[in-house]
Amino acid sequence: MSRFWSPVVHTLTPYVPGEQPQLKRLLKLNTNESPYGPSPLVLAAIAEQNTADLRLYPDPSGFELKQTIAQQYGLAVDQIFLGNGSDEVLAHVFLGLLKHEQAVLFPDITYSFYPVYCKLFGIQAQTVPLGSNFEICLADYAKPNGGIIFPNPNAPTGRALASKAIAGLIQTNPNSVIVIDEAYVDYGTESCVPLLQGDSCPENVLVIQTLSKSRALAGLRVGFAMGHPRLIEALERVKNSFNSYPLGRLAQAGARAAIADQNYLEAISAKVIATRQVLITALDRLGFNTITSTANFVFTRHPQHTGVQLYQTLRARGIVVRHFNLPRIADYLRITIGTDEQNSELIQALQEII
């Protein structure tokens, strides 16, 4: 604490990211990174960049990357916004589109950066409780609001909504911005991007994705939003009032290659999905209660062991998972899906513990 802090700093409770262990021998299953490397085309695209050009600023608009994303998703270039990871995109969304007189709505158990942004930007927020099975109950969002945001699938639960249900939410909230955070969409969830295609694109819907998960580029920091050009214009205004150059040359080159290599995306996503099912089956046999997941993680608890006990015991064995010391979910662990070998090591440890 310092006397030089501004008043807002005293009120902040910052987001706490998952641990990044310094010990290399640890099995890291806590931050939902891909267990596989990025596409070889990504590495080649980065290597082909002229390092002499690193003295020059990158394209502030990221036009070529926007073109690649637009072509891949069937959208127009002016429907794409780029950011330094989806967290930066979300920050601009909260400031540019969700700060209104009425409160923004989001689930009570969800991505914990949402309330942090609300506090930082002075945005009113109202959490909406998940159902008894940790499902998002869209009927509970039928109330006056200054915007609605939720991940699909939700995090940390992994539960997803069908795009048809979300389309109904959009129709009943024509005067609010609806933000669908699709960080984990490629592991079995139906994307809402088709709702944005063509002349019928709703004026109030934004879909956010990232290259950090299924495209295995968490270290490159690239995220993007897709939506109506008027929403994108608002985000560009915020970005250019904050940082006109969010993506470096190497990031833009690597991201273009990652977006274009759909075959690699589908291949490694399929591997994660298969390994996820193996883990769920093993957890069931050990007596765990696991929430149905369409993400690259599972959310699970054991009726005879507390969450913190399991977390600490696994940590002592060199396996790091995520534990949230929060109401309703304190006994749950969020476990990232690793390789088949990592999965086997985790299952063996749990068998010995249980």
Please identify what each model-predicted range represents:
Residues T313-R317, R322, L326-I354:
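PLP-dependent enzyme catalytic core of the Aspartate aminotransferase-like
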Residues N204-D284, F288-I291:
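PLP-dependent aminotransferase class I/II
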Residues F63-A103:
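Phosphate-binding glycine-rich loop
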Residues G96-P151:
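PLP-dependent aminotransferase-like
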Residues K119, E135-P144, P156-I178, E182-L217, ...:
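Active-site pre-lysine segment of PLP-dependent enzymes
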Residues M1-L56, P144:
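N-terminal "arm"/small-domain region of PLP-dependent enzymes with the aminotransferase-like
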Residues V272-I273, R285-R317, L333:
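Conserved PLP-binding catalytic core of the aspartate aminotransferase-like
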